[in-house]
Amino acid sequence: MNGIMTTSSHSNFYNQDLVGAPSSSDHIPGPSSQDQPTNNNSPQHHHQHDQSQTTHQNHPLNQPIHHHPTQQNQSESQQSRQSHHLQQQQQQQQQQQQNQHNQQNLASSSTSYEMPSIYQQFTGSYQQTRVPKNFLLENANYYTLQPGFPLVQAADYYSTPTTTSANDYQNSTINSIISPSFQMGSVSTPDTQNSSIRSKQQQQHSYQQQQPQQLSQSQHQSQVPDIFYTQGGTIGGYVTTKQQQKEFSRKTSGDQTLVPQTNSKLQQQISETSYSQQQQQQQSPPTPQKQQQQQHYQHQTTQPYGGTGFMLYSQTGGPSSSPVAGNISIPTTIATTGQPNSQFQFTYGSPQQGSSSKTNQMYLYQRQQQQQQQHQQPQSQQMSQISQLSQQIPPQGSSKNISINSTPTKSRASSITTRSGRQSRSTSISSFIPQPDYPERVIRPKVATTRWDDENTNCYQVRARNILVSRREDTNYINGTKLLNVIGMTRGKRDGILKTEKIKNVVKVGSMNLKGVWIPFDRAYEIARNEGVDSLLYPLFVKNIKQYFLTKGHKLKSEDDEQEILEEGMTRQREEVRREGRSNGVGDFHNEEEEEIVGIQEDAGPNTAENDVPGDDEEEEDDDDDDDDDEEEGEQDDEEEEDGSSTSMSSSKNSESKLLETRDVIKSIVEEGDSTTGNVSEVKYVHEYLERSPQSTAIKEEDLYYGSSHNTPLTVHKTL
């Protein structure tokens, strides 16, 4: 015994000044009352009292004890010496266990994550310096009863266990009011985490003898396998950031299926506990509580972050700003994870560093219980549950071991889901937008509008035979000069018709499409209808052309499409003519063509002669300046027409000579017979050659644009 006085580390040392707090002598069993009054101050009985106190430590605390009145007169020096003596015994036991555990770790260490020997020695010395850390939980609930510590936990997460030990734990006062600072201090200390399985069980047995109030807590501790207590432990709950990063990267690395074979004892314990739990599940019939737990488990798997139960905050109305220690361990049942027959203990704080084998074994233990629960369900439910878990649950164990340190993974997963949700929304919206099928080439519309700035109006233009015929929007006047050009009239006839018009508007300044003599709508429609070009100029003569242009103008075909239609019609006519020529004979067909050519040549002469007469009449009759300008233009056009007639005569003679030359060849082909395929092909070739000749095309265009001032193709073949 030391003669030096030291401060007591007993918890009653802090409770002596409190009102209603029991003294330390109430819980210390003394010797018999006969020897105590006489031998109270002798040094021998000090030694006897120490022996009696050590022998009577197995006496339960909640058992009624009858003390002698003189027992309360014990001095405070005896209390301090006794408590110091107990403290030294506890420290010696802790040092022995620490040394044994260090030797075991050095002997059986095979992984790269175990703690070095220097760090373990530091833990032992650090525990010696932190003497007031080992509290005896006699008045542990005092701090929770004060108004400054309203730490009432959510009782919903502790109401579903079905085992007897869980019921004992449920009936205890710790379920309703939990002290986060002193709840599991003597059970989940770093010493017990550092010890092996057997030493931990022995130490739990000694704690049960000293404090039987912790019976339910020790039962809860004995059910938890050692895989949740990593080697090395934590120093008073303080973990460095590097160790946290290592643990976090180890959890998220994904190497959860590889379990080392070093810890054979732990694997045996896992198999034994799983086998005993399987037997209990087979013996006990399915109760409605289990069915509710299974439904709750499926709901939690479908919504892993839906509820706040994983964060273990108070939901019963208590303030959320209550102080919580950093190294507390909150016992939670597996009601949230759907495993009723086992209880786990998660740390509400920094993660514990340790070897990767124990974390992998923790995941293996959970997977074994998942497989047991799945085998009890029907096969169809098992397949559906596997599909749901594979689609919706992140890596195994992440939704079941959620602490504050797993919030980075939660936020990362939520950000991924929101990002994918935004992508899915964008694709779904774009899928409903109608995608117009654009044509392969841009089609020029048949009806177009142009701005006439000089007249301050708009004009609608319709293209026919490569000529634009315009119509004013304000007065509906139509350019008669362009209209007569589409009809194909000569210069003289056109000028004669336009001069006889009573209502007209002569335009000499502007673009080529807008120059000419403008006549009213009714007169222009009458001329077009009489000449048969009203359908060709559609929709120029629609009454409400503005509304038609806005509604149906874009649907009209362009000039190119119109030319394609005309070419198709011409090819059909050619095929019909070929069929008729084969049936009647090729010679007769060419004779008919020659007769047509001769008729055209005979008609060309008098037409050119007649074109000079209106020009002379106009010079004699009209005296206006406009008429004089028209006369000059008419004279120039007449000269061009004479040149055109001469070229047409020469071209017709050349074509006639060529046709006469090829007549003998065609007759020889016809005499040989049309039955052979080669002869038929030769006939077709000759016929197509004659049609492709420039003379025949010139004749057709002469027939089409006869007497017009715009029949420029007739002047192209002067070199022939």
UniProtKB/Swiss-Prot annotation:
SUPFAM superfamilies: DNA-binding domain of Mlu1-box binding protein MBP1. It is found in: Nucleus. Residues 569-582 have a biased composition (Basic and acidic residues). Residues 1-15, 22-35, 181-200, 254-266, 313-336, 400-413 have a biased composition (Polar residues). GO terms for molecular function: DNA-binding transcription factor activity; sequence-specific DNA binding. Keywords: DNA-binding, Nucleus, Transcription, Transcription regulation, Virulence. Coiled coil: none annotated. One of its GO terms (cellular component) is nucleus. The keyword Acetylation does not apply. Residues 1-111, 181-223, 245-336, 365-437, 569-662 are annotated as: Disordered. This is Transcriptional regulator EFH1.
